[in-house]
Amino acid sequence: VGVGASFITTLIASFYAYIATLNSNFIKELFDRLIDAFLSLPSIIFIMIFSSISGGRLFTIILIIGLCSWMQSAKVILGALKTMLKSDFIAQAKINGATHFKLIFFEALPNLKALLFTLFGINAAHAIAMEATLSFFGVGSDLSAISLGLMLNESTQALFMGSWWVVLFPGAVLFLLILSFAILSTSSNGKGIKI
């Protein structure tokens, strides 16, 4: 779930940044307002609504999480691209006749691979937490599928009966899974988390 949704999120965010860096001031203004509007809405509400309608298939959950979580990454990639487009090697590529598509996808984005890897890891951790939240609340997840959120949901009754260890293990696995993606995402810039 995490890797698939993160791939969709990073792909949409990169394409959004490509469109938003076109030379038209109207497009830049429109896309700035569009992303601010999307960021003002809580994505968890939309994810829960669309997941409850979808029927709980895994691919659909991955797609919904990816489609509802791209805004923060798009804002970060767009800011980095705007800075990168002012650099000397981009000016040289423009002089050599590079198209806007080539400037973004073959010149700028390859130089942002550390940032993209970091965003990929953060988005994967976010997607895992979202899927666990959906499964915990029983929204849009297949009850026959194996999920840490479903395990936590089923173990809450045991918690009230004094069996705290039933909640501990799925919660610890979920925590360690999210932590591992966070560590992987910060290791790309050489300043990883020291444990």
Question: In which residue ranges do the predicted regions lie?
Answer:
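A short glycine-centered flexible hinge/capping loop motif at secondary-structure junctions
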Residues: 9, 13, 17, 21-24, ...
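Generic hydrophobic transmembrane alpha-helix motif, especially the helices
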Residues: 11-74, 79-83
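Transmembrane alpha-helix boundary and packing residues in multipass membrane permease domains
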Residues: 18, 47-52, 61, 65, ...
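Glycine-rich helix-loop "coupling/hinge" segments at transmembrane-helix boundaries
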Residues: 51-55, 80-81, 130-174
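C-terminal transmembrane helix and the adjacent membrane-cytosol boundary/short C-terminal tail
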Residues: 58, 67-68, 114, 120-122, ...
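Amphipathic cytosolic juxtamembrane alpha-helices at the membrane-cytosol interface
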Residues: 4, 24-27, 82-86, 91-118
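Hydrophobic alpha-helical transmembrane segments of multipass integral membrane proteins
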Residues: 1-20, 46, 50, 105, ...
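Hydrophobic alpha-helical segments of integral membrane proteins
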Residues: 26-34, 38, 108, 148-151, ...
